[in-house]
UniProtKB/Swiss-Prot annotation:
GO terms for molecular function: rRNA (guanine-N7-)-methyltransferase activity. This is Ribosomal RNA small subunit methyltransferase G. Gene3D superfamilies: Vaccinia Virus protein VP39. It is found in: Cytoplasm. Its EC number is 2.1.1.170. It catalyses: guanosine(527) in 16S rRNA + S-adenosyl-L-methionine = N(7)-methylguanosine(527) in 16S rRNA + S-adenosyl-L-homocysteine. InterPro entries: rRNA_ssu_MeTfrase_G, SAM-dependent_MTases_sf. PANTHER family: S-ADENOSYL-L-METHIONINE-DEPENDENT METHYLTRANSFERASES SUPERFAMILY PROTEIN. Specifically methylates the N7 position of guanine in position 527 of 16S rRNA. It comes from Shigella dysenteriae serotype 1 (strain Sd197).
Length: 207
């Protein structure tokens, strides 16, 4: 699995240390193990997880601005866990409302010794925003309008929303509330992954 990950990272142009690679593989192995009992993801094959979960998450890392992030509706830690491994200098709050997912995240935190994550069980609209975050991240969480509506209190004045999407969400962008502005839409290149991937970056401060 290490060889496959190294090749994928090379194709993606993402240089990582051996320690970071081993952490990512350990996370995949834990996800595969816990998935049998906890049903954390529909992806069953660890090699497929490397592409659809690991690479699909970390290709976003170069576009994140700031040091404090919150991953809303993180599920089993996607994209928050892979991003925290790639960006060890940043801090990631991993938010999910289901206890079994948060228990898994805490076990990952313990076994991988990840000091820059904080798993939290809470609904996003009930989670306090002090201090505010530099970025609010979501992957397959909600429409753009629902994301900014439910998470409007989380980013700081210069914070941003980072929405990971599949196909270009033109309809969602057209319907976005007027007080929010799409700063950029990045077409992401994920090696060995069929289908399109886009990152929508939305300014949190009102126009």
């Amino acid at each position: 699995m290490l060889n496959k990950l190294s090749l994928l990272l090379k194709d993606a142009g993402i240089p990582l240390t051996d320690h970071q690679k081993n952490q990512l593989i350990a996370y995949v192995n834990m996800l595969h193990k816990w998935n049998k009992a906890y049903n954390l993801t529909s992806v069953r094959d660890p090699n497929e997880m490397l592409v659809r979960h690991i690479l699909d998450s970390i290709v976003v890392a170069p576009y994140l601005q700031g040091e404090r992030f919150i991953d809303v509706g993180t599920g089993p830690g996607l994209p928050g866990i892979p991003l925290s491994i790639v960006r060890p200098e940043a801090h990631f709050t991993l938010l999910d409302s289901l206890g079994k997912r948060v228990r898994f995240l805490r076990q990952v935190q313990h076994e991988l010794k990840l000091e820059n994550i904080e798993p939290v069980q809470s609904r996003v609209e009930e989670f306090p925003s002090e201090p505010p975050f530099d970025g609010v991240i979501s992957r397959a969480f909600a429409s753009l309008n629902d994301m900014v509506s439910w998470c409007h209190h989380l980013p700081g004045e210069q914070g941003r929303f980072y929405a990971l999407k599949g196909q270009m969400p033109e309809d969602e962008i057209a319907l976005l509330h007027e007080e929010y502005q799409v700063e950029s839409v990045v077409k992401l290149q994920v090696p060995a992954l069929d289908g399109e991937r886009h990152l929508v970056v939305i300014k949190a401060n009102k126009i």
